[in-house]
Amino acid sequence: MTALATEVRRGPGYWLGGYRAMLRYDLLNMRDFLSFFLLIQVLMGAGMAIIYGFYFEEVPPLAATFIATGAPTLAIVPVGMTLVPAAVAQYKWSNTYDFLWSLPVPRLVTAASNFTIFTVLSVPGFVVTLLVAAWRYDLDLAVSWSIVPAVLAASLMAVSVGWGAAHAIPDPRITNLLVNLVIFVVLLFSPIAFPIENFPDWLASLHRVLPFWSMANVVRAGLTDGLVADLGRHYAVLAAWTVCAWTVAAWVVGRRR
């Protein structure tokens, strides 16, 4: 008798093969939206960098530095915390959500593909926003190598939180409401483009726990010299939010049948 060949569906080779397949699938599935995503990212980041300057008759140097170094963070936030939930909500509205989970790849591969695409997608808008902001305020920023882990940490945290929340919330309408709330809070009540000392104590204390201030500070530390203190604490805040988001994501993935 001839032994039947069986396909090994475990191990690093199978996982990496599924990861490459999901990357291709997701890129093809989102190809019509990627340019739109980038446009929104640039408009929110570079657009706010320009608009904030109109709040001053003459922008003081420190204020200009905060705006120019905070604007790139504003370009990162919408990718992870608005566009990722919107993409997941679209799957649910179009009744392809269950199909996504039925694909013959490990479920964590589906999450890893999304994390990779949206984290990388944050980079072009970040760069464009930084260039526009530096031009608008005529600044010579002290860009250092630490900007690389800063952008990756901030982007991964935002994508992780957006992905975990979007999958954990069953009703896409609620997801859409929360997305709009996040944008409202980030634009009006987050110390991203100005010092946290401008806030009352209770709101400043809240933002020391929320991720937005820490996102801005790790990015700002990679663009300036001596403006950010206690950088390790800010990375710890981002790491805590990322781990919590991954825990939620693992729970969501694990309970799918």
Q: Where are the predicted features?
A:
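Transmembrane helix segments
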Residues: 56, 168-209, 213
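Transmembrane helix-boundary elements of multi-pass transport/secretion proteins
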Residues: 10-15, 25-92, 142-147, 177, ...
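Transmembrane alpha-helix boundary and packing residues in multipass membrane permease domains
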Residues: 49-54, 130-134, 163, 167, ...
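Transmembrane helix-loop junction
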Residues: 53, 57, 90, 134, ...
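Small-residue-enriched core segments of transmembrane alpha-helices in multipass membrane transport
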Residues: 68-77, 148-161, 181-188
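Alpha-helical transmembrane segments and their short interhelical loops
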Residues: 107-108, 112-179, 227-247
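Short hydrophobic, aromatic-rich alpha-helical segments embedded in or entering the lipid bilayer
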Residues: 2-3, 8-24, 192-235
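Hydrophobic alpha-helical transmembrane segments of multi-pass membrane transport proteins
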Residues: 47, 51, 64-136
